[in-house]
């Protein structure tokens, strides 16, 4: 059964203008919406006063928070920055939205889970983050739900990539074009997610009259980072983005030696989101993104 939907008529504010989610939202935005995209230069959400000023400038009906601290490894040695942006700023933002009756959609991560189960995580499963980044995102979720006064909706997603910004797909393509041997972790499992597909889901979600407090969104399927890299190589080679398949070899998480611990398995159960927008296989969405990159040269 499809959720009851409504048409949004008030302006929408998207926070995090330069990130790949914001750029994906802009690329997939329906023409019927009035949307302001603000980056940190115009709206630093760590300033509660500035947030209040911006929200009072227009009669916003919805705020989408696509900003955040995303440096997973750096967060292990930075005691303040991750929590300032992912927790405290979100707490203040949710409070301001709640007081004004503005709906808030806040983006979060699969890294709030510890990866110790072997089936996709449901929205109602209890988070247990392994890293400081994951902890900062979880605290942000809790604050958004508590201070949003019933107006907050959390969207967790995983392994984001797109034609925009910095992400695994674009990094792999750059390294593959250099022809160097690459070692990629093969014992972390999850689901790659096209930010373009995420954007399409969010535009559908905002029409739901009574949304759930938490949704999970990703592409369909489960893979490892190594298999993801192999698919990037195969698809990019077929599209002419690479002259030959990349030289890839698997490596364990322990051998790779990243600063931050990551979940062994962090696939998300998206059944609750499928009634809003049916998802596609991650391999199919990957080809679409690679095709766009090929067109851009």
What do these predicted ranges mean?
Residues 36-49:
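Rossmann-fold cofactor-recognition segment
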Residues 48-87, 98:
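NAD(P)H-binding glycine-rich loop region in Rossmannoid oxidoreductase-like domains
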Residues 84, 88-92, 99, 112-155, ...:
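Catalytic helix-loop patch of NAD(P)-dependent Rossmann-fold dehydrogenases
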Residues 201, 208-258:
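Mid/C-terminal beta-alpha module of Rossmann-like enzyme folds, strongest
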Residues 280-297:
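Amphipathic terminal alpha-helices
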Residues 10-28:
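N-terminal Rossmann NAD(P)H-binding glycine-rich loop of SDR-like oxidoreductase domains
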Residues 142-190, 196-203:
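NAD(P)-dependent short-chain dehydrogenase/reductase
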């Amino acid at each position: 059964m499809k959720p009851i939907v409504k048409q949004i008529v008030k302006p929408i504010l998207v926070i995090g203008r330069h990130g790949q989610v914001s750029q994906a939202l802009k690329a997939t935005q329906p023409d019927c919406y009035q949307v302001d995209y603000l980056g940190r230069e115009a709206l630093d959400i760590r300033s509660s006063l500035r947030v209040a000023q911006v929200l009072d400038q227009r009669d916003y009906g919805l705020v989408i928070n696509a900003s955040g601290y995303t440096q997973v490894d750096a967060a292990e040695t930075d005691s303040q920055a991750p929590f300032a942006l992912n927790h405290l700023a979100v707490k203040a933002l949710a409070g301001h939205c709640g007081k004004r009756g503005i709906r808030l959609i806040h983006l979060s991560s699969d890294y709030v889970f510890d990866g110790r189960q072997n089936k996709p995580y449901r929205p109602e499963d209890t988070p247990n983050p392994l890293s400081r980044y994951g902890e900062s995102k979880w605290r942000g979720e809790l604050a958004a739900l508590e201070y949003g006064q019933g107006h907050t909706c959390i969207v967790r997603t995983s392994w984001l990539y797109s034609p925009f910004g910095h992400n695994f797909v674009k990094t792999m393509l750059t390294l593959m074009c250099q022809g160097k041997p690459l070692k990629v972790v093969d014992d972390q499992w999850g689901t790659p997610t096209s930010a373009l597909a995420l954007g399409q889901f969010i535009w559908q979600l905002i029409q739901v009259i009574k949304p759930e407090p938490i949704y999970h969104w990703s592409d369909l399927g489960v893979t490892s980072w190594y298999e993801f890299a192999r698919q990037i190589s195969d698809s990019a080679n077929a599209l002419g983005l690479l002259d030959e398949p990349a030289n890839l070899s698997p490596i364990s998480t322990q051998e790779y030696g990243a600063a931050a611990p990551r979940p062994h398995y962090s696939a998300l159960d998206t059944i609750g989101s499928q009634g809003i927008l049916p998802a596609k296989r991650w391999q199919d969405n990957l080809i679409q993104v690679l095709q766009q990159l090929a067109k851009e040269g």
